[in-house]
Amino acid sequence: MVQITEVNESKAGTANRTAAHTHIKGLGLDDTGAARQVEGGFVGQVEAREACGVIVDLIKAKKMSGRAILLAGGPSTGKTALALAISQELGPKVPFCPLVGSELYSVEVKKTETLMENFRRAIGLRIKETKEVYEGEVTELTPEDAENPLGGYGKTISHVIVGLKSAKGTKTLRLDPTIYDSIQKEKVSIGDVIYIEANTGAVKRVGRSDAYATEFDLEAEEYVPLPKGEVHKKKEIVQDVTLHDLDIANARPQGGQDVISMMGQLMKPKKTEITEKLRFEVNKVVAKYVDQGVAELIPGVLFIDEANMLDIEIFTYLNKALESDIAPIVVLASNRGMTTVRGTEDVISPHGIPADLIDRLLIVRTLPYNKDEIRLIIERRSAVENLALEDGALDILADMATHTSLRYALQLLSPAGILSSTAGRQKITIDDINEAKMLFIDAKRSTKILENSDRYM
């Protein structure tokens, strides 16, 4: 007998993954732009959040492009969280390009080139195009053939007759034979809802008409209603691209589909460096589209974390790039005080950034959290991770975060949760926290052990 067993659906695939900033939903401001004490995943940092709220308003009003902001504060004070909240407030339509200072260094490509690539990634272009389309349910699909002009017994398709039906009428179209190939590729049959672009002849199958929903088919079909209005209509199509997408499209022309072309592409794994001339040409085309009203430029946000890792050459290039006609809003974050600028030997500057660039920055300061705020953060974070804490355990974690770091206290939550469930408890207790603390030491204790030990090389 053949053994057949049912596979139970696993819930593991649908479980949400918890990242460091999963709980951040926005800046948590009210209608007047004032920050609430606890809102949007944030606790405290009222002045910094209000400052970021003003920046968001300026970005939306398109009055902020080509300027730079510095988020300055100690470790674990929410600098990255603020940058993420800015992107959440701006929404998915505004480009947000995050990177770390060390990402700009590469053996293959110049660091200034990598910076410019990310600059262009953070600038969006919204292209609005009005297209004439024929849309409806296919009622007739008849290819008409003619004698082969080259002679012989074969026949060629001279044109295709397609009948389309919409809510307001029907139309019969005579189409070019090249469109018949597109119809075959989309596997269009009578009863399907399609649209055909008048200018390009592109065919798109939308789905099966819901009039055929009672049919029994082995394949799962997507049933769509009969299109409203006339068969022939004008449709506005909005496309969002970045300037980097346009650069790449022009820098890497597609080769042929033959084996030699494909092998040639495989043999070139090196990154293509986009020239200034190409970018200038792309900018000219973009400017023409903007003047015609076809496209709209959307300056986004380029977030560079650990800005103190950038060197003097990148900072010099950044000064020039910020003054260009097309520039995004640059948000830098640094947790350093007075430190040497990388790439120099004796230039000591605030946050590791040269004085001439510091002068161009709007600086937003983040302050260390007090014990009550830390307690609230741990409580909220434990709720995100679906962990229940006893009040005593919460107090111990808050104390620990005050003396060590907030990150260390938050990182102990998951191990303490596992220890608690292993012991058969529903809530994390003080014992679980102490056991996790014994198993995983913090940076200060590790330093003390190394100072008092001679057993290390």
From Swiss-Prot:
InterPro entries: AAA+_ATPase (IPR003593), P-loop_NTPase (IPR027417), RuvB-like (IPR027238), RuvB-like_C (IPR041048), RuvBL1/2_DNA/RNA_bd_dom (IPR042487), TIP49_P-loop (IPR010339). ATP binds at residues 73-80. One of its GO terms (cellular component) is Ino80 complex. Its EC number is 3.6.4.12. Pfam families: TIP49, TIP49_C. GO terms for molecular function: 3'-5' DNA helicase activity; 5'-3' DNA helicase activity; ATP binding; ATP hydrolysis activity. It catalyses: ATP + H2O = ADP + phosphate + H(+). It is found in: Nucleus. Keywords: Activator, ATP-binding, Chromatin regulator, DNA damage, DNA repair, Helicase, Hydrolase, Nucleotide-binding, Nucleus, Transcription, Transcription regulation. Its main location: nucleus. It comes from the Eukaryota. It is an enzyme of class 3 (hydrolase). One of its GO terms (biological process) is chromatin remodeling. Belongs to the RuvB family. DNA helicase which participates in several chromatin remodeling complexes, including the SWR1 and the INO80 complexes. The SWR1 complex mediates the ATP-dependent exchange of histone H2A for the H2A variant HZT1 leading to transcriptional regulation of selected genes by chromatin remodeling. The INO80 complex remodels chromatin by shifting nucleosomes and is involved in DNA repair. Also involved in pre-rRNA processing. May form heterododecamers with RVB2. Component of the SWR1 chromatin remodeling complex, the INO80 chromatin remodeling complex, and of the R2TP complex. This is RuvB-like helicase 1. The lineage of its organism: Eukaryota, Fungi, Dikarya, Ascomycota, Saccharomycotina.
